[in-house]
Amino acid sequence: LYNPDSIAAAIRRLMDGSLFTADELIQHHDLYHSLLHHGSFSAPTADECLERINARLSAGAEFLAAADRIIITFGTSYVYRWKGTGLVVGNCHKMPDSYFRRERLSVDEIADTWLPLMDCIHRRRPTLKWIFTVSPVRHLRDGAHENNLSKSVLLLAIEKIISHYPTIANYFPAYELMMDELRDYRFYAEDMCHPSPAAVRYIGDRFESTYMDAKTIAWLRRAEALHRDLQHRPFRPDSEAHRLFVVKTKLKQDQLRAELPT
């Protein structure tokens, strides 16, 4: 999700835990879709689509209930509204443009959506912290000027939101790091819109040094190494060497899980 309205809708749903129903789906090209979800949730039947969506919703709600921080990244202030209902969609599923109305949210519209949401969550979870960022990915469909206007709206909206909750919300300058410290085009991928791997590492390192202590960073490095091990695809899965690799990987996984705070 990239726009503030859809992100807020997702968090609201995760907090109240209400399951999706068939009347929230649409059928297009022999598939059932949710306008709030990625295409990977779409399915040939409504039941299968809902099963995928609600399983992920339940897992996400459980994860959010245990979280002590929420990191929010706004990508664009442009939204697409489904003409039938006025709903701001998270995914158009490659349907015709004529089904949607495109518009740019204002600073006040974004703040008016997020402030009541955060107030509601803060009353239930007073210790929960928020980290807001603006994505450095450039949305150039309408040109660089429109992208800059869109990002400006996001920056001003976040400033307004944080000013209401200075003790529980702050801003991480991912966008500014890309625009100022990494402004050379060698820090962009070939599409000239996304940050290069080097830029991603640079911004990630700055995030770690801002929000994590040395012990947490060490855990993160171990988790990254473990993730690489788990993604390994053996040439000979029936070999003794691979069996030992699996045993060692499971041991590292158990050790890390035992050390991490619950």
Go through each PLM region and give its residues:
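Extracellular glycan-modifying ectodomains
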Residues: 1-262
